[in-house]
Swiss-Prot record:
<keyword id="KW-0689">Ribosomal protein</keyword>
<keyword id="KW-0687">Ribonucleoprotein</keyword>
<dbReference type="InterPro" id="IPR019906">
    <property type="entry name" value="Ribosomal_uL6_bac-type"/>
</dbReference>
<keyword id="KW-0694">RNA-binding</keyword>
<dbReference type="GO" id="GO:0002181">
    <property type="term" value="P:cytoplasmic translation"/>
</dbReference>
<comment type="similarity">
    <text>Belongs to the universal ribosomal protein uL6 family.</text>
</comment>
<protein>
    <recommendedName>
        <fullName>Large ribosomal subunit protein uL6</fullName>
    </recommendedName>
</protein>
<dbReference type="GO" id="GO:0019843">
    <property type="term" value="F:rRNA binding"/>
</dbReference>
<keyword id="KW-0699">rRNA-binding</keyword>
<dbReference type="GO" id="GO:0022625">
    <property type="term" value="C:cytosolic large ribosomal subunit"/>
</dbReference>
<dbReference type="InterPro" id="IPR002358">
    <property type="entry name" value="Ribosomal_uL6_CS"/>
</dbReference>
<comment type="subunit">
    <text>Part of the 50S ribosomal subunit.</text>
</comment>
<dbReference type="InterPro" id="IPR020040">
    <property type="entry name" value="Ribosomal_uL6_a/b-dom"/>
</dbReference>
<dbReference type="Pfam" id="PF00347">
    <property type="entry name" value="Ribosomal_L6"/>
</dbReference>
<dbReference type="InterPro" id="IPR036789">
    <property type="entry name" value="Ribosomal_uL6-like_a/b-dom_sf"/>
</dbReference>
<comment type="function">
    <text>This protein binds to the 23S rRNA, and is important in its secondary structure. It is located near the subunit interface in the base of the L7/L12 stalk, and near the tRNA binding site of the peptidyltransferase center.</text>
</comment>
<dbReference type="GO" id="GO:0003735">
    <property type="term" value="F:structural constituent of ribosome"/>
</dbReference>
Amino acid sequence: MSRVGKNPVSVPANVEVRLSGSEVEVKGPLGMLRHELVSDISIERKGESLLVKAADDSKHANAMWGTTRALLANMVKGVTTGFEKRLILVGVGYRAQAADNVLNLTLGFSHPIAHKMPEGIKVETPSQTEVVIKGMDKQQVGQVAADVRAYREPEPYKGKGVRYADEVIVLKETKKK
């Protein structure tokens, strides 16, 4: 029995959900998201909410029950408010600049890095050391943020690198004689 799966997903008035066979389509003010359902899962509409049900008591069906419910909730939130990840660049000369759909990074390498954003992802740079990645798809926003962070992960001695805004870097102590 899934504790997450048995909770209904509330659908706001400005969101339209279309169930067709094994596909769910969620349309809202920010756009549209589509998800392919697993055969062990069914979705039932009850008024202003969606109920996710497992077809049987198999281990796979129970595992996918909570997962599908969480994915649906994220789709509804994504098309209404969207998701965002904030990155902070810490280091001398580390800079970021957003131009159209490309994020230009200077991270202490001998060359600048131009990271092209995928479809549906927007990037902003409120300051030279701050990057904001926005989009409807939670997984895609997180993946792009992880890709940008991977260019220069925070090092453990001074904390220099690209980090998430809410990330705490535990610094190591330097060796003493």
